[in-house]
Amino acid sequence: MDKGSAATPPAGPGASGTTPYEAIKAIPVRHYGRWISAVVVAVLLGWLVYAFSQGKIIWATVGDKLFDPSVLSGLGNTVIISVSSMALGLVLGILFAVMRLSKNPVTSFVSWLYIWFFRGTPVYVQLLVWFNLSLIFQYINLGPIYKNETVDVLTPFMVALLGLGLNEGAYMAEIVRSGIQSVDEGQSEASHALGMTGMQTMRRVVLPQAMRVIIPPTGNEFINMLKTSSLVSAVQYPELLRASSNIGTTAGAIMEMLFVASIWYLTLTSIFSVGQYYLERRYARGSLRTLPPTPFERLKANLNMFRRTEVAK
């Protein structure tokens, strides 16, 4: 056999003079369940829209009162009391979490008692207790330092701040405690070996690492605080729900103003949910190799998949 014949490839499928390979035709998977569920959801939404459109609701009033000065003032007060109460709750949460983990049995017991009491009683009851505290103590007397009537000290804002902030502090204490305990004890031991004090170790080593565990539930707590703040309308604080209810009672548009309040609550929670999402991504950078896609990245990926499906057809 000569070299020419040895170098010639054997005849077979796809060679010259034979039937060429056929291109593979990819058939996309049909997700019939998704289409069925989408139709069911669309029908239910259509039914709800139709039901509300036929009800005795003046939708023009909703649009007219959406930016009413009283409503916007109540909206601002809602944000102020929510941020203030959350800040107080966060400070108290860190303090009582550290006390709870202390080796001192007295401070640990005091922290446990605080958490047990404020988590075990409804926040609405706590607000009413603060609001009616003047029935028990007519004066707040600190001796030569300060003395004043309780009614003058416990304004609606102070009542709302104490009621929401102290209650939130109990929940934040458990969240912070779980975050601190998630950090390996070797980190603290190494810090002590380097000569750091307990407070320096907590501030520079433990808490920064614990933030990955603390941030997600803290964001949820703040969003919940925005909605829980509606309870302070019972103690005369002029927040969003109270402002809307006052207008609704005066104008005879109670349901319309409840819809106005709901729209603003949804707007606030949506805005802060986006902020929470990106804050979680920031603190997840050191723990995840690949960060979860953002909503815009998911939308882009879905559009690309849809285009590839159309091309395949």
Name the predicted role of every residue range.
Residues 1-313:
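Transmembrane alpha-helices and adjacent helix-loop boundaries
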